[in-house]
Amino acid sequence: FRSSAASDVYKRQELIEAVKELELDEIVDILQNLPEERMNKILSNMSLVDRKRIEIGLTFPDNTAGGLLNTDVISVRPNNSINEVISYLRDQEELPENTDKIFVVNNENEYLGELLISRILTSKPTMLVREIMETEFLPIDAGLDDKEVATIFERNNLISSSVVDKDGKLIGRITIDDVVDVIREDADQNLLG
């Protein structure tokens, strides 16, 4: 009995460590397929920040933008200077994968626009975010069907896009690698189907 219990603890700890190495959207995909009790055990062993981020993803069906989103997102305020943004970015251990832009939000976390990394690098340090941010491209609604998300990415040649909830608050982003998975699944279904 003891060796079995010890083995279970070891396996659980091994699973928790393996999960920590995955992207948050991949963790959500795995957790959605586990029994609720096991999912809750894994969540309870995560940091509060990671748990909250994962719980956001778990609230959406996996065939929606919300199911694809990753909460590893960088956002800034419109009144920040470019110098402040650069300093903030340097303070990060690393940028999230496929970061080609950061998002601009107000104090209530409502999406206002996006700021391309290339614009940050080529703008004067004293300029304000609001002076150079892009506002034309609308964020993706979390409830949008994943195939429609793929179409938006394809049509606009996107690497990443913001995702907002029904109130327009930034809740994450979708990156091209997630969209490629949707395209592959759709192609496989069409091939078999």
Task: Briefly describe each language-model feature range.
Residues 1-6, 10:
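Single conserved hydrophobic/aromatic residue that forms the stacking wall/gate
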Residues 7, 19, 68, 109, ...:
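Residue-level signature of catalytic and energy-coupling elements of molecular machines
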Residues 11-14, 18, 22-26, 30, ...:
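Structural recognition of alpha-solenoid helical scaffolds
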Residues 19-23, 28-34, 77-98, 140-157:
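The conserved cystathionine-beta-synthase
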Residues 63-75, 128-137:
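Bateman (tandem CBS) regulatory domains
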Residues 89, 102-116, 153, 161-179:
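A glycine-centered beta-loop-beta connector
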Residues 100, 114-119, 133-142, 157:
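Divalent-cation
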Residues 178-193:
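Non-transmembrane, extramembrane segments of multi-pass ion/lipid transporters
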